[in-house]
Amino acid sequence: MASGEKSRMLFERTKELFPGGVNSPVRAAVKPYPFYVKRGEGAYLYTVDGARIVDLVLAYGPLILGHKHPRVLEAVEEALARGWLYGAPGEAEVLLAEKILGYVKRGGMIRFVNSGTEATMTAIRLARGYTGRDLILKFDGCYHGSHDAVLVAAGSAAAHYGVPTSAGVPEAVARLTLVTPYNDVEALERVFAEYGDRIAGVIVEPVIANAGVIPPRREFLAALQRLSRESGALLILDEVVTGFRLGLEGAQGYFNIEGDIIVLGKIIGGGFPVGAVAGSREVMSLLTPQGKVFNAGTFNAHPITMAAGLATLKALEEEPVYSVSREAAKALEEAASEVLDRTGLPYTINRVESMMQLFIGVEEVSNAAQARKADKKFYVKLHEEMLRRGVFIAPSNLEAVFTGLPHQGEALEIAVEGLRSSLKTVLGS
């Protein structure tokens, strides 16, 4: 078992220290208590209880190279030897910015921050500052962090104004965010017909990664781009997950769509805290100190993060990361399909390159409402069975399975067999 006596004792201590015993809610979803990690290397996590686990979570997306990749480790050690915080610019942020912009916004500009939440918050403020408008449009099931403007769900069917999904978010703030279904062109057109001249920005995950994995319909993306441009709203592509995972050009290159503002995180930090906002010079020049849209941060463009991110992107350019990751996810998809096809049980597997999720009890998942109808109890049992077999998938089917460079050879064999045998066990229970 991944969680043993040492993990249990640590959890008893942390329950007295942290709300719910953890510092991010999803970590508490591993039952009966989280396993505590001693170290990570390659495809594996090693727990304080002596278990070795194949990691198909990869820190919820950032570690596409796996744990402790040699080039990232070397870059971080070299950066640490030079000092780890200056309060002044360094060369690494210049090199990383040039590399990122070359792929996601040629000729544009970028601002580094410290998390995806900070990045989406800054992007929304920037869209409002640029357009002079007040409303933001988001989509049901898309996750954009933990600030007030995006902790919002759809209200009554008669209105598009959002309602808070968290205590502490004022209703007046939530009403500045419109919410409509993902992948629904007709609903999108209705929102723009009614509110188009007030919408500052449309923020969207090109592939939903926090209601399971839900790929976009191409006509939906095309409508997003067309309606945003026609109305004068800025299209904000939240590529915190998809950026540098679907390819070097992210979802923009993969789906042939262009955002006005691109939000990045996760992979570009190489496993260290990071976020970024990229856009045209016209839009980005509004950020302080050049313009009047405020953003600042002691840890923005942190030297260690910049070094890790630069090493990661170089590895993505030079190593077979995308092909290996894709084939690993494909192998998992095929193993699950092989077992489930024999049962007659309705299911669907959504996979986009190296991110995927399995939904039991539904034959299609193209929006969050359909994802929520999937059999959650089945998935939790699957998660638990796989953990018993030394394979870690997210504890909720509203998260994603991620594969990366180290998921090959023995690690992939363990993962595939763990999935296959776990499915058979759950189906037989």
From Swiss-Prot:
GO terms for biological process: protoporphyrinogen IX biosynthetic process. Its EC number is 5.4.3.8. Keywords: Cytoplasm, Isomerase, Porphyrin biosynthesis, Pyridoxal phosphate. Pathway: Porphyrin-containing compound metabolism; protoporphyrin-IX biosynthesis; 5-aminolevulinate from L-glutamyl-tRNA(Glu): step 2/2. The keyword Glycoprotein does not apply. It is found in: Cytoplasm. InterPro entries: 4pyrrol_synth_GluAld_NH2Trfase, Aminotrans_3, Aminotrans_3_PPA_site, PyrdxlP-dep_Trfase, PyrdxlP-dep_Trfase_major, PyrdxlP-dep_Trfase_small. It catalyses: (S)-4-amino-5-oxopentanoate = 5-aminolevulinate. Its cofactor is pyridoxal 5'-phosphate. One of its GO terms (cellular component) is cytoplasm. It comes from the Archaea. GO terms for molecular function: glutamate-1-semialdehyde 2,1-aminomutase activity; pyridoxal phosphate binding; transaminase activity. It holds the Pfam family Aminotran_3. The modification N6-(pyridoxal phosphate)lysine is found at K266. HAMAP family: HemL_aminotrans_3. Belongs to the class-III pyridoxal-phosphate-dependent aminotransferase family. HemL subfamily. This is Glutamate-1-semialdehyde 2,1-aminomutase. It comes from Aeropyrum pernix (strain ATCC 700893 / DSM 11879 / JCM 9820 / NBRC 100138 / K1). The gene is hemL.
